[in-house]
């Protein structure tokens, strides 16, 4: 990361993160680089989605507790719970993150738009 900063990087972004503690640990390890670290936020949409990310995508961990929350969920119920999990992540990292990198799952842009509205509401609370 330091090499990227030396070559002009103005921010860094992560893969989707589902554990706030992991992001905060990464932030602590990279905090002296002088650029914002933006966590990837991709709402889960189903149990299958959570399991796939956890088991098949290197570098992405979906904690046991979150996989348990997604158990048996799909379609609208899965998307609702995935948004709730994403909001909780944003709440837990809001004061530390340099912003967020929102990733709409499967082209479901409406989920990212809901998170944008949520983030803007959080920002207004601080004013």
Residue ranges and their predicted role:
Residues 1, 23, 82, 86, ...:
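Aromatic/hydrophobic pocket-lining residues that form the small-molecule binding cavity
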Residues 4, 8, 39, 100:
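Conserved, mostly hydrophobic/aromatic
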Residues 7, 88-99:
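A structural motif corresponding to the C-terminal end of an alpha-helix
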Residues 10-19, 101-104:
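Catalytic beta/alpha-barrel core
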Residues 16-32, 107-118:
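Active-site-adjacent beta->alpha loops and helix N-cap segments on the catalytic face
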Residues 32-89, 106, 120-127:
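Active-site pocket-lining/capping segments in soluble small-molecule metabolic enzymes
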Residues 94, 113-124:
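A short, amphipathic alpha-helical segment
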């Amino acid at each position: 990361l330091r090499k990227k900063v030396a070559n002009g990087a103005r921010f860094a972004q992560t893969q989707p993160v589902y554990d706030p503690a992991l992001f905060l640990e990464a932030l602590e390890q990279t905090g002296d680089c002088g650029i914002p670290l933006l966590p990837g936020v991709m709402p889960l949409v189903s149990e299958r989605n959570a399991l796939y990310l956890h088991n098949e995508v290197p570098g992405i961990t979906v904690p046991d507790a979150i996989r348990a929350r997604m158990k048996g969920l799909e379609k609208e119920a899965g998307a609702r719970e995935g948004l709730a999990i994403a909001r909780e992540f944003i709440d837990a990292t809001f004061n530390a993150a340099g912003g967020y990198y929102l990733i709409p799952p499967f082209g479901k842009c409406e989920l990212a738009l809901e998170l944008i509205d949520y983030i803007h509401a959080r920002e207004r609370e601080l004013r």
